[in-house]
């Protein structure tokens, strides 16, 4: 029985990135031998075991053969005679197909080190096309490693386009699409995930709501970049620079989906996009099972971002109404999240990336002023029932007016 560290842990170690999960491959063993050695069986589809002490996953070396559609349509073969090289050959990218033995010796049969040095994401073998999930995984790795200068090899991009054309992407489950998108949100460059998917034609299949934004014009006066799709990528980039919050990054990426359904006769104006975008966000989130926390923030940003951009023009009553619609009295963290998305939207425009966003301060001050009005004081002054809310709002408006 030989045990090797494999995959992402080896890659990230060589890139001097933090290693969070360590996966191991066991060569020359069997399920019976693993159980006898004290390992605990956990694999449903193929033999994976937890180490008795570290609880890290150890998988028996295996090969895979395509038997059906989608990323689950594989037959696994595992046996003591499956070599480490056989196991590494079935992996997606050369930089993920390296192993390390217990003495620290690197095993790299498919040129992973060469591609690490060249900063290239390249498929290991032509069998890459058999698993549609790899399209999303490569896009995510492109986002994860973009800050180091990594790009997708042209021939790998061609294979990704081939997977898209085969129709296999349609067999990905909603959960897997969300899982990869969600992971991409935690990278330094989430916009690269969307860009790579668009470059190979996958965005139109997995996230058509975002794909249809490309080619839709906006008024050049406000949007020098003109194209709504390009604006969305720029906003995604700005949101990642402004905030580590994944719901904020998600909401920023979907805030303008309503522009994708504006009739061309109305272009470049999008007067109703804050309204039309709501149903699109609802159905997108339902389709790929986006958690409520992400959905609710996205809906709030979609509905109110245009109002917040006009903060200096709004009457005190309107500012208070917007704060109420954002539910900030019950969810005080919501305002900061929405304002971050709006700032990303404001800066996600060509040549305006470093533009200040005074609207943020205007709304924060309005919120603090309104918050300073105590409901207890209203009750103490003898107001009852519905009168309490009316008087509270009146006093809050006065507090905002006094700024």
From Swiss-Prot:
Residues 228-329 form the HD domain. Its EC number is 2.7.7.72, 3.1.3.-, 3.1.4.-. GO terms for biological process: RNA repair; tRNA 3'-terminal CCA addition. The keyword Hydrolase applies. Mg(2+) binds at residues 21, 23. Its cofactor is Mg(2+); Ni(2+). ATP binds at residues 8, 11, 91, 137, 140. InterPro entries: CCA_bact, HD/PDEase_dom, HD_domain, NT_sf, PolA_pol_head_dom, PolyA_RNA-bd, tRNA_CCA-adding_enzyme. Keywords: ATP-binding, Hydrolase, Magnesium, Metal-binding, Multifunctional enzyme, Nickel, Nucleotide-binding, Nucleotidyltransferase, RNA repair, RNA-binding, Transferase, tRNA processing. PROSITE patterns: HD. It catalyses: a tRNA precursor + 2 CTP + ATP = a tRNA with a 3' CCA end + 3 diphosphate; a tRNA with a 3' CCA end + 2 CTP + ATP = a tRNA with a 3' CCACCA end + 3 diphosphate. GO terms for molecular function: ATP binding; CCA tRNA nucleotidyltransferase activity; cyclic-nucleotide phosphodiesterase activity; magnesium ion binding; phosphatase activity; tRNA binding. Magnesium is required for nucleotidyltransferase activity. Nickel for phosphatase activity. CTP binds at residues 8, 11, 91, 137, 140. The keyword Nucleotide-binding applies. Pfam families: HD, PolyA_pol, PolyA_pol_RNAbd. A single active site specifically recognizes both ATP and CTP and is responsible for their addition. Monomer. Can also form homodimers and oligomers. Belongs to the tRNA nucleotidyltransferase/poly(A) polymerase family. Bacterial CCA-adding enzyme type 1 subfamily. Comprises two domains: an N-terminal domain containing the nucleotidyltransferase activity and a C-terminal HD domain associated with both phosphodiesterase and phosphatase activities. Catalyzes the addition and repair of the essential 3'-terminal CCA sequence in tRNAs without using a nucleic acid template. Adds these three nucleotides in the order of C, C, and A to the tRNA nucleotide-73, using CTP and ATP as substrates and producing inorganic pyrophosphate. tRNA 3'-terminal CCA addition is required both for tRNA processing and repair. Also involved in tRNA surveillance by mediating tandem CCA addition to generate a CCACCA at the 3' terminus of unstable tRNAs. While stable tRNAs receive only 3'-terminal CCA, unstable tRNAs are marked with CCACCA and rapidly degraded. This is Multifunctional CCA protein. It comes from Vibrio cholerae serotype O1 (strain ATCC 39541 / Classical Ogawa 395 / O395).
């Amino acid at each position: 029985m030989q045990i090797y560290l494999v995959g992402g842990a080896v890659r990230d170690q060589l890139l001097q990135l933090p290693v969070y999960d360590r996966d191991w491959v066991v060569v020359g063993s069997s399920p019976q031998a693993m159980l006898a050695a004290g390992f605990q069986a956990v694999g449903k589809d193929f033999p994976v075991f937890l180490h008795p002490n570290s609880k890290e996953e150890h998988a028996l070396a295996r090969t895979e053969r395509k038997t059906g559609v989608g990323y689950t349509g594989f037959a696994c073969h595992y046996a003591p005679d499956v070599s480490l090289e056989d196991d590494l050959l079935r992996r997606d990218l050369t930089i993920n197909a390296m192993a390390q033995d217990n003495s620290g010796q690197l095993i790299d049969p498919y040129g992973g080190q060469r591609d690490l040095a060249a900063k290239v994401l390249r498929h290991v073998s032509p069998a890459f096309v058999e698993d549609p999930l790899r399209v999303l995984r490569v896009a995510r790795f492109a986002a994860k490693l973009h800050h180091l200068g990594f790009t997708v090899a042209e021939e790998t991009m061609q294979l990704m386009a081939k997977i898209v054309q085969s129709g296999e992407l349609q067999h990905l489950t909603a959960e897997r699409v969300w899982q990869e998108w969600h992971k991409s949100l935690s990278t330094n460059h989430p916009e690269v995930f969307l860009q790579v998917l668009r470059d190979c034609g996958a965005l139109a299949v997995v996230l058509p709501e975002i794909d249809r934004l490309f080619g839709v014009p906006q008024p050049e006066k406000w949007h020098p970049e003109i194209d709504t799709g390009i604006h969305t990528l720029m906003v995604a980039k700005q949101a990642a620079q402004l905030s580590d919050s994944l719901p904020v990054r998600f909401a920023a990426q979907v805030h303008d989906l309503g522009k994708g359904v504006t009739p061309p006769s109305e272009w470049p104006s999008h007067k109703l996009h804050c309204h039309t975008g709501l149903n699109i966000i609802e159905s997108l989130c339902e389709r790929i099972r986006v958690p409520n926390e992400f959905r609710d923030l996205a809906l709030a940003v979609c509905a109110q971002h245009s109002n917040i951009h006009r903060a200096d023009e709004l009457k005190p009553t309107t500012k208070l109404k917007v704060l109420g619609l954002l539910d900030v009295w019950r969810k005080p963290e919501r305002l900061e999240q929405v304002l971050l998305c709006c700032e990303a939207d404001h800066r996600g425009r060509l040549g305006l990336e470093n533009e200040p966003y005074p609207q943020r301060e205007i709304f924060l001050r309005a919120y603090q002023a309104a918050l300073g009005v105590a409901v207890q004081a209203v009750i103490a002054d003898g107001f009852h029932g519905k009168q309490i809310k009316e008087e509270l709002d009146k006093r809050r408006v006065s507090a905002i007016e006094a700024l």
